[in-house]
From Swiss-Prot:
The Walker A ATP-binding motif also binds Pi and PPi. Residues 209-218 are annotated as: Important for the catalytic mechanism of both phosphorylation and dephosphorylation. The lineage of its organism: Bacteria, Pseudomonadati, Pseudomonadota, Betaproteobacteria, Burkholderiales. Pfam families: Hpr_kinase_C, Hpr_kinase_N. This is HPr kinase/phosphorylase. One of its GO terms (molecular function) is protein serine/threonine kinase activity. The active site is at H146, K167, D185 (proton acceptor), R252.
Length: 319
């Protein structure tokens, strides 16, 4: 699901402090929004914010020093024509950056068309970076997943599995080993670009971990600030299964890395069977370390297969 709504008023309030901008014209259009169809087609936030460009309609148009110079250079008729064309682009809002003064014709046409016009002294490049980062998260594809999401050895890891397998207890042990909690039970996942998923905790569950028999634990209060994280990028899913399920549904040594599709992105997946006496926390950390090696191009299984083939070839040559 991708949200499609944000008003000019909400955008203005969101950055009132960081951009210190003013609302110069179009005050009556505080509810003006992005075109929902444009949002659904956008490949990234770069499609939603950029410098003034007449071939990219329906996006936030940023007017820096060069753009204002272009609009005001030439005869009065040329300037009026260039400014009038901006309205035909139907931007959700205009932003004057670089401390530029608004040309009178621009103020007039924005007021007539009820087109929100903001002005800031910040650089146009900074404004674009800030708005793109915000909109990429606001309009990101999103879903929720049941599990415990953690920072393990610097990697965002989702621990999943059926109820009763001890996911929260495992999370607690991993926290006691110096890892960090992002979210327990319900994890909000956002696709913030073409190949990145970010996981966050719902506000209601922030810093909380539920352990059966004990109840809710405030991890931040018990273990300190360093035991919790606001967000992490999802890089690995560790799925816990019972022994009978593991033997029935999974290979002991898979020949190819497992993945799970999350919001259209394949995420590495590791299966760990839960059996009495196994130290699952150590196994999870080992799986994370192995995944880090794989991301660096070191594949232990492939190395073993190559070594095995080499040994077989040597054996044949000896015969």
């Amino acid at each position: 699901m991708k949200p499609t709504v944000i008003s000019a008023d909400a955008m203005f309030e969101e950055f009132r402090g960081s951009l210190r901008w003013e609302w110069l014209a179009g005050l009556g259009a505080s509810e003006r929004q992005f075109d929902p169809e444009v949002i659904s087609r956008a490949q990234s936030a770069a499609d939603l914010v950029g410098y003034l460009n007449y071939i990219h309609p329906y996006r936030v148009q940023i007017l820096g020093a060069r753009e204002v110079a272009y609009l005001t250079r030439g005869s009065q008729e040329d300037c009026a024509r260039r400014i009038a064309r901006i309205v035909t682009l139907e931007p959700p809002m205009l932003v004057l950056a670089d401390g530029q003064a608004a040309p009178d014709e621009l103020l007039s046409i924005c007021e007539r068309a009820q087109l929100p016009l903001f002005a800031t002294r910040e650089s146009s490049a900074f404004v674009i970076d800030l708005l793109r980062a915000y909109l990429s998260k606001h309009f990101a594809e999103r879903t929720s997943m049941h599990g415990v999401f953690m920072d393990i050895l610097g990697m965002g890891v989702m621990i999943t599995g059926e109820s009763g397998l001890g996911k929260s207890e495992l999370g607690l042990e991993l926290i006691s080993r110096g890892n960090g909690l992002v979210a327990d039970d319900a994890v909000d996942l956002f696709r913030i670009n073409q190949n990145t998923i970010e996981g966050r905790c719902p506000d209601l569950l922030l810093n909380l971990l539920e352990v059966r028999g004990i109840g809710l634990l405030d991890i931040r209060a018990i273990f300190g600030e360093t035991a919790v994280r606001r967000k992490m990028r999802l890089k690995l899913i560790v799925h816990l299964v019972r022994r009978d399920s593991f033997e029935r549904d999974y290979e002991r040594m898979p020949s190819a890395p497992l993945t799970q599709d999350v919001l259209g992105i394949p995420v590495r997946k590791v299966i760990i069977q839960v059996v009495a006496g196994r130290n699952i926390a150590v196994l999870v950390e080992a799986a994370v370390r192995n995944s880090i090696l794989q991301l660096r191009g070191i594949d232990t299984y492939a190395d073993f297969v190559a070594r095995h083939h080499k040994a077989m070839e040597s054996g044949r040559d000896g015969d």
